[in-house]
Amino acid sequence: MSWEYKRRVKDYETDRMGVVHHSNYLRLLEDARMDWLGDNLISYSKLEKSGVIIPCVSASGDFLNYLRYDDPFKVVMRLTGFKGVKMSFAYEIINTDTNELCYKGVSSHFFAKDGSYKPYLSFRKDFPELYKKMTALVEP
């Protein structure tokens, strides 16, 4: 199931050239992912309070068009894989005024016990409802 996160570009996200700085695209993806998590599973703060974190293993993407200050955009994302504790996402960032695809990327993460930064191998057993919901959300 694809999911959308919408907002406008903020001034501090742009660089001297007047476009969103490349480092901020990962922040936009994180904002979208945190909203997705809260809307579909559990808020990240509740997850952390239960002793679980979600480190990023990899992220990559292509910059296809520019976003500028105050441009409205949406991040269209989907969970493309979930293997027990490891998960992968695909993203598209689209300027909603022009409908231009501005960025296309992927990221990989995993559930870990807070402080360990190692895969939470008993995640399925310890969080069966969350595991079940996560499995149902996968859209390859």
Give the role of each language-model region.
Residues 20, 54-56, 102:
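A broad, structural micro-motif
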Residues 1-5, 68-69, 80-140:
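HotDog/MaoC-like acyl-thioester-processing domains
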Residues 35, 62, 129-133:
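Solvent-exposed, charged/polar functional surfaces in cytosolic regulatory/catalytic domains
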Residues 8-10, 15-16, 43, 50, ...:
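Glycine-rich, flexible loop/turn motifs
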Residues 6-10, 62, 110:
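Generic structural detector for well-ordered beta-strands
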Residues 1-36:
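Catalytic strand-loop segment that frames the active site of acyl-thioester-processing enzymes
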Residues 36-87:
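Hydrophobic beta-strand-centered segment that forms part of the acyl-chain substrate-binding groove
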